[in-house]
């Protein structure tokens, strides 16, 4: 977000969203905005690994669900308050990502995707069958609302503002990880890994940091989800959660964290606009994803990108009026060493200060 236009657009959008939430949105609209903010955090995290590094991870839904379960169990079983449940919700997915990163990130792209999908499915099986801890298919009920000291953020406007403040923190983290030379290193690693290695870019360390940061933001989103709705069930680990986060990232613009926010706002509101087609939401998401790929290859964020500047007309360069005198002039020189012809009719001229290398059969 170093582009001034992008910062201005983000600032205007944030102010407009805050004004809408404070003065115009009802309780249900605030609930939808809260859900959009939660998924925006998960999508910003996914944009780090998928958009920036180009690695198709299928475990972001797993990290989202793990964060929700960690926060729910921390509140219900350990009696932890909100700041601590939030920390647990971030820490547990981050630790899992750190443990699996070393073997998984060494895999080629399609094997990496399959490995992360296997981890996600394993997490779903554990959540469904480990009834003594996770509640099985019934899940966890009664996760307390968010209270910070004597201030309640349980629902309505306070919860919405808190969630979107976390969106701002997620955007800040993403920006700090991809700004300046770090961003150039990441882009080089994505487009030309061999060139990046030749330039001294530590690709393994970058992939590790981005994978763990992606999981941490997924866990943060899941923890907020658990407190926002008070229920955690195996549904948070289902494949459709990943599909939703992936669609948000692509439709919004995989190259931009702001695009992830725009994609979340759009796709969370789509079911509200098309309630009559609620049973076909995956079809709607698929159609929106296909349309974005065809008509908006840079996503919604591409609509706010830098405009192309017209080419600058330049005058033809004039030849120097007083050319420098020649120091050396060679015409049609030939040289043979036995049966090897080193030079055959070679001509060249050298001006003062000019350096010329002549490479023949012997180097």
PLM feature segments, named:
Residues 1-41, 70, 77-85, 155:
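Membrane-interfacial amphipathic/re-entrant helices at transmembrane-helix boundaries
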Residues 26-77, 99-114, 186-197, 202-203, ...:
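Single transmembrane alpha-helix segments in multi-pass membrane proteins
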Residues 61, 97, 207-295:
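Transmembrane alpha-helical segments in multi-pass inner-membrane proteins
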Residues 78-121, 262-263:
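Alpha-helical transmembrane segments within multi-pass membrane transporters and channels
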Residues 119-153, 183, 297-307:
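Extracellular/periplasmic helix-loop junction at the C-terminal end of a transmembrane helix
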Residues 154-233:
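Helix-loop-helix "hairpin" substructures at the membrane interface of multi-pass membrane proteins
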Residues 303-336:
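ABC-family P-loop ATPase nucleotide-binding domain
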Residues 328, 343-345:
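Conserved structural motif at the start of ABC-family nucleotide-binding domains
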